[in-house]
Structure formats: structure tokens, C-alpha cells
């Protein structure tokens, strides 16, 4: 009986929630060096745990070498120069069509292993136009999280009146 109870308690404490949902409205913009998006997870040490999505131009086409301002936060932490083509191919995709975008983080790292309990930062970066970037970030403690919304903070490289400022809007993150 004790073994069953211990196993049950272990299951309940490790399965507090299944994933984190990340939803946002994306509007395709015109202009030089725009429409670049990256979504990734960092641990409490500021190390990348997993890239969930990054646009092809920046990743697969190594666009960050042509335009240093393209997703410079993601490039700085993900270090795509050290990634193989197959690693980049696994996380990159075409720039999405305008509309609401839905992504999930399944609490795994880039190798598909469940992450240990702890604090993680989910970050969504958008290159709006040339050197103008935004980063939306939410924090989740996988060892102490309850289902519901995650507060999202926005960091801008320029004022809100910058060109293409409406590219990423209504960013929502939640524990499911």
C-alpha cells in the first residue's frame, strides 16, 4: 500500500501541468529586415534549453550573418553558428501567415528530455524593422506552477511608435 501511495504522490507532484501554451497575433509587415520571429526557453542561468520556433531566413539561411540585427537576442544565446543544418532545420520554418499563432512548450529540452523542476523563461523575439526588436518574456516555475495565465513582460529596443510595431501583439502564455 505504501508503494502505491508513494508512486501516486510522485506522479501527482511531477505532473502538475503538461505544457505551456504561447499564443500571439502576427501581422506580416513590409520593409527591410522585418518579419523575423524566434521563440525559445531559457533556464535560470540564462542558458538556452530549447528553441521552439525560428524563422527560416534568420536560421536556415543564416540571415543573421547578412543582417546582424535579425533576432539578435536569439542569435546571441542560441549560437546558431555552432548548430548543424539538421539541428536548425528541426526548429526553423517559413515566416508564418498573418493571424493568430499557437505554440506549445512540452517541458522538454532540445534533446526531447523532460527538464528538471525549476524556473524557466519563455521568450518571443520579433525583428520589426532593421534594428528594432521586441522581446516578450514570461516566467514559469515548473516545480511550483498551477494552471493559468503567465504574466508577460515586453521589452522594446525602441519606443512603441517604431515602424511595424504591430507585428507581434496580444502575446499570451499560460500553463496548461
Please place each PLM-identified region on the residue numbering:
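Structured domain cores in non-transmembrane regions
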Residues: 44-116
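Residue-level preference for beta-strand/loop junctions
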Residues: 33, 97-99, 118, 167
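Bacterial N-terminal signal peptides that target proteins for export
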Residues: 1-5, 39
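Primarily secretory-pathway and cell-envelope proteins
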Residues: 18-61, 132-176
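Short, cysteine-centered beta-strand-loop-beta hairpins and adjacent loop/turn segments enriched
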Residues: 112, 131-132
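Beta-strand-rich extracellular modules
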Residues: 125-129
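Sec-dependent N-terminal signal peptides
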Residues: 4-14
Amino acid at each position: 500500500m505504501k508503494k502505491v501511495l508513494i508512486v501516486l504522490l510522485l506522479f501527482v507532484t511531477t505532473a502538475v501541468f503538461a505544457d505551456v501554451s504561447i499564443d500571439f497575433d502576427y501581422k506580416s509587415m513590409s520593409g527591410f529586415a522585418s518579419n523575423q520571429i524566434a521563440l525559445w526557453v531559457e533556464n535560470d542561468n540564462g542558458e538556452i534549453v530549447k528553441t521552439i520556433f525560428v524563422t527560416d531566413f534568420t536560421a536556415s539561411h543564416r540571415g543573421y550573418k547578412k543582417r546582424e540585427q535579425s533576432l539578435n537576442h536569439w542569435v546571441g544565446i542560441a549560437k546558431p553558428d555552432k548548430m548543424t543544418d539538421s539541428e536548425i532545420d528541426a526548429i526553423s520554418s517559413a515566416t508564418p501567415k498573418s493571424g493568430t499563432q499557437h505554440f506549445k512548450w512540452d517541458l522538454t529540452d532540445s534533446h526531447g528530455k523532460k527538464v528538471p523542476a525549476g524556473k524557466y523563461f519563455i521568450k518571443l523575439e520579433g525583428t520589426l524593422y532593421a534594428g528594432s526588436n521586441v522581446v516578450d518574456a514570461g516566467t514559469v516555475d515548473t516545480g511550483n506552477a498551477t494552471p493559468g495565465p503567465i504574466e508577460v513582460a515586453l521589452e522594446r529596443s525602441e519606443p512603441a511608435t517604431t515602424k511595424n510595431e504591430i507585428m507581434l501583439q496580444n502575446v499570451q502564455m499560460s500553463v496548461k
